[in-house]
């Protein structure tokens, strides 16, 4: 079998950090994988809100946000890579995509251009979105290695967990997709 036919693609999957996660940056996280290929992987942590809200962030980038329900929506820590850059995970846009959008096959869209934020500020943006600062990134083979060492569980992503479940409940909700709860997980890997 060739390498291209036996490799898995985890795009549009949740990565759920196991209790024995070696990197404390990802302890207790759920990551939505936007892209996974032989070159590496890119994802956004969806359950780690920051102290920054949309009103504060929009003010920093000279955008006026006056939509009351959005003012105090938290901005999330998306991962340790490019933490000064915004990444917006949202439902696919009808018609033309935003300037820098990546469509996730079978899933959502991720946009990095300011036009999506301008649309949010004007009330014409995506109805459901999650804004992160930074992203999680893995080089070629790095994520697969972490999974093989029991660092992550994987499960097909459910957009309802991204947008409709409170941040503090997303880890348990993602685990429930696998039929397990957090108390069932151990930091020890089994060996035969």
From Swiss-Prot:
SUPFAM superfamilies: VC0467-like. InterPro entries: AlgH-like. The lineage of its organism: Bacteria, Pseudomonadati, Pseudomonadota, Betaproteobacteria, Burkholderiales. NCBIfam families: PRK00228.1-1, PRK00228.1-2. Belongs to the UPF0301 (AlgH) family. This is UPF0301 protein Bxeno_A0649. One of its GO terms (cellular component) is cytosol.
